[in-house]
């Protein structure tokens, strides 16, 4: 009988656990199956499979799920970054309009690195709201794009814009009849995202450098410090949990019956 070391046993056990927690929609975020599952053409009249990454601010999609976006794009998916705001409050000492112009250019530069498309919503950084008008705006984008997969913020977060973004997407998911797979991503866990316990991981080791290149496009945000002090350590920590160098972590929310948070009338 072949002897199995404790390390190999743990790694195998981790793999079994990851498989058990794999997505019901053919393991979209299961790193071991990305190259195989995601390279296959869509079953819907040959159209590309589509994912939306919906973030509250410019730089949120790239920092919370940039590696996964790149892997999806490499596998032939159409990926759209949806920015709830233009980052109007994100640069001290200048007007909201000036900040928005700078940060919009940074978003476009980041999307050129990743290859994702981009869309901007009409909310204002630091003053996002939950009402029917803003809910309809998110729902209209989702209905127009018809994604199979949506990634957005984890709802338990110290930043109000992150919470509002998460709730708006959640209600759109419910109203659409759970028509897409919904995943929550973490933002600076322990500082912003709280009580985040992953159900799924993606090994982003092969694309970590490209993810960081996209993040660095957001020059106005002091990204070297943000990456070095928060995001890269978080990627390495999730990598240790998933037995790789760098990983992104997610919570997969499955459809259920629950009251809406948004007024529908």
Please state what every model-predicted region is:
Residues 79, 118, 180:
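Hydrophobic anchor at the start of a short beta-strand
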Residues 94-114:
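Glycine-rich phosphate-binding loop and adjoining beta1-alpha1-beta2 segment
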Residues 51-58, 62-96:
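ATP-dependent adenylation/pyrophosphate-handling site
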